[in-house]
């Protein structure tokens, strides 16, 4: 039986399939009842191209014994990329390197904790940084200093990508941790996050709100398109932890209904939300191809899906993204912002609570905090952003591009995002005094404490 609700002015609602539906009342214009014709509906039209929540139902799972709510609030600056001194770039192509005004904001607890890290010159403020500098210490060796930091990396290695949105964010967390700076003066790893929340082993996402505003013009027409998607539309989970080599972090896509032939079994499952733009391993003609083998006419390579995959302005617009015009092209008001709201886990399976620290873990290490044991870095939603322009390269599909500049003492942001997020931690273990006393009395049976 569907739940029903009534609001003033005769508006009726019914809860079905995970959301409230507005019931259309019959017209009273005629003597006899006539049902209103179901004409074109904007919501159904948009969902035909991009459904942010494809199906939802709730599963009855036991609630935790104790919970704690944590909140994040802050601002994210979407800035243009920088390049290190051009004279040291290998190959001498620095003068011909361009970047696109695209961004990707992943909603996961790991990156929100990174966004609220300590605001010091060795952490992230102003980002990206080429490496971690020596913060304190009197000896020449970095390993003998506190905190243990390293010198900057080689200037030919990229320091960050637009997917690392937390580097350009100022986020506040409530409740605060007064010992966070002394315990974790550097960037927190998954092991540090597990120790920070060692008393909790479950977490869930309640709600996240985004308000995006375009701040920079690019020609006479330069709106910023933003689209909130469930889960990971174009990305995959990072199975290689703390790897500085980006190529080792890439994964081979396994997409359904493409007709591709995979020569190896990957770690990813097929995702129905992906557009089959490219098969994983298309058969191609090589020196060992037998005569008479039917192959495709177009030569293509393996479909690599990485964290650095973004959507163009035209793609986001075709999927029904909102537009935000910068000041000068439209008067600034509340409607100048693109409003996005994500609620729940965004999981059609209905999994509400996720594992923060696995049960039975006496010593929290990176192996315990890595997938699939811990789901701390699970993406619940992803916000894709791209700025359009009336003059762009053809293969960029209307996306604004720019020439990479050398680092200066100020950042050039083309969009600003206001964020509010609510999460909840849980613990299913029974925190009863008799259980604790029994554990203390039996823990050292047969051993010497």
Curated annotation (Swiss-Prot):
Residues 1-43 are annotated as: DNA-binding. One of its GO terms (cellular component) is host cell nucleus. Residues 6-47 are annotated as: Nuclear localization signals. Induction: VP1 and VP2 are detected 12 hours post infection, while VP3 only after 24 hours. Its main location: host cell. Homomultimer (Potential). Interacts with Rep; this interaction relocates Rep into the nucleus. This is Capsid protein. It comes from Chicken anemia virus (isolate Australia) (CAV). The gene is VP1.
